[in-house]
Curated annotation (Swiss-Prot):
Database matches in InterPro entries: Lipase_panc (IPR002331)
Species in which this protein is naturally found: Felis catus
Regulation: Inhibited by bile salts, is reactivated by (pro)colipase/CLPS.
GO function terms (MF aspect): all-trans-retinyl-palmitate hydrolase, all-trans-retinol forming activity; triacylglycerol lipase activity
Annotated function: Plays an important role in fat metabolism. It preferentially splits the esters of long-chain fatty acids at positions 1 and 3, producing mainly 2-monoacylglycerol and free fatty acids, and shows considerably higher activity against insoluble emulsified substrates than against soluble ones.
Protein name in UniProt: Pancreatic triacylglycerol lipase
Biological process, per Gene Ontology: lipid catabolic process
Length: 25
C-alpha cells in the first residue's frame, strides 16, 4: 500500500516515516 501527498509524492506506508502520515507537516 502507498500513501500519496500532493507536495511529497507517493511513499510506501511501511517506510520508517509512515507515522507522520497521520500528522500535518
Amino acid at each position: 500500500k502507498e500513501i500519496c501527498f500532493p507536495r511529497l509524492g507517493c511513499f510506501s506506508d511501511d517506510a520508517p516515516w509512515a507515522g507522520i502520515a497521520q500528522r500535518p507537516l
